[in-house]
């Protein structure tokens, strides 16, 4: 083959390829860049939570205040929060009043705590040099006035559902001393023994009487003193006289003034009254 017809060497396609054909991997994002990219998403979620909670709070506060939700459909967020704060303060006052009524010791604890706080404020104002004298005087005067109002507070006890029963304790004197007791009529159907040894006995005419052991006669076999449910009972003749509850008598030895008290109208003798009495045993 002649030399002029020889093929010229050609460049290889692989060798002629660019050198930057290989792609480099992406660099990982830093923590600050991640926070910046996720901040709008987190802000959107936070606002959604706030709006949802305010919507639920609006429904609850309108139901608690018994207001029509259709008339308050466009309440602002500030209005909802203000209504909630006022409602919670009212609930706190009611709970405090109920606690003071049911437990009087709570008022004493509150007074002690308020007095301690007043002393701390007084001590701080007396040692602090940057407080104006006028402001210090006004503040201490206000706290002293509030403390005086708290000390003067008197909470009335709730009225008792029990019905008062007036009974009399017979003695040697002609005018017995009335005693006021609290007895629930629903619980006085049958004889009951209470703490202290006294017994409540219902009579046949619907009245009640107490049997209280007399400590002056401890040597005798258990004498008791009857107490009368009604101090004055109108006799058939129209005059008023002391009338005992039927069926009451003394145990053991009889006493002279007790024998007179057992007589229904004061005209019968002690023997007649002893025969006509009703003995519960």
UniProtKB/Swiss-Prot annotation:
Motif (WRPW motif): 278-281
Tissue expression profile of the protein: Shows a complex and dynamic expression pattern in developing embryos. In neurulae, expressed in the presumptive floor plate, the anterior part of the prechordal plate and in the anterior neural border. In tailbud embryos, expressed in various neuroectoderm derivatives and in the mesoderm, where expression is limited to the presomitic mesoderm (PSM) and pronephros. In the PSM, expressed in an anterior stripe prior to the formation of each somite. Expression in the presumptive neural crest is disputed.
Induction / repression: By Notch-signaling. Acts in a complex regulatory loop with other bHLH proteins.
Presence of the UniProt keyword Lipoprotein in the record: no
Residue numbers spanned by region Disordered: 1-44, 262-281
Disulphide bridges, residue numbers: none
Biased composition (Basic and acidic residues): 26-35
Domain bHLH intervals: 34-91
One GO cellular component term: nucleus
Complex formation: Transcription repression requires formation of a complex with a corepressor protein of the Groucho/TLE family. Binds DNA in the form of a heterodimer with the bHLH protein hey1/hrt1. Interacts (via Orange domain) with id3 (via HLH domain). Interacts with the bHLH protein hes6; this interaction may inhibit the transcriptional repressor activity.
Function: Transcriptional repressor. Binds DNA on N-box motifs: 5'-CACNAG-3'. Plays a role in the patterning of tissue boundaries. Promotes floor plate development and prechordal plate development. Required for lens development as early as the stage of lens field formation, partly through regulation of gene expression of the cell cycle inhibitor cdknx/p27(xic1). A role in neural crest development is disputed.
Protein name according to UniProt: Transcription factor HES-4-A
Source organism per UniProt: Xenopus laevis
Lineage per the UniProt record: Eukaryota, Metazoa, Chordata, Craniata, Vertebrata
């Amino acid at each position: 083959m002649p030399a002029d017809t020889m093929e010229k060497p050609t460049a290889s396609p692989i060798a002629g390829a660019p050198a930057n054909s290989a792609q480099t991997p992406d660099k990982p994002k830093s923590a600050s860049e991640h926070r910046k990219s996720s901040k709008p998403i987190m802000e959107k979620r936070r606002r959604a939570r706030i709006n949802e909670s305010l919507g639920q709070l609006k429904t609850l506060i309108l139901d608690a205040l018994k207001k029509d939700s259709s008339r308050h459909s466009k309440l602002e967020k500030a209005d909802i929060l203000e209504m909630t704060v006022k409602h919670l303060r009212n609930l706190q006052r009611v709970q405090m009043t109920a606690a003071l009524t049911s437990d009087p010791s709570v008022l004493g604890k509150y007074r002690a705590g308020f007095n301690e706080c007043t002393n701390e404020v007084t001590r701080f104002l007396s040692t602090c040099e940057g407080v104006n004298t006028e402001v210090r005087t006004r503040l201490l005067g206000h706290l002293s006035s509030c403390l005086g109002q708290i000390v003067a507070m008197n909470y009335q006890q709730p009225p008792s559902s029990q019905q008062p029963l007036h009974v009399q304790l017979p003695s040697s004197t002609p005018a017995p001393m009335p005693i006021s007791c609290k007895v629930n009529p629903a619980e006085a159907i049958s004889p009951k023994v209470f703490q202290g040894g006294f017994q409540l006995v219902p009579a046949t005419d619907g009245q009640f009487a107490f049997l209280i052991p007399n400590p002056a006669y401890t040597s005798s076999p258990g004498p008791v003193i009857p107490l009368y449910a009604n101090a004055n009972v109108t006799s058939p003749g129209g005059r008023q006289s002391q009338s005992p509850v039927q069926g009451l008598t003394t145990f053991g030895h009889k006493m002279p003034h007790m024998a007179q008290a057992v007589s229904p109208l004061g005209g019968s003798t002690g023997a007649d009254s002893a025969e006509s009495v009703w003995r519960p045993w």
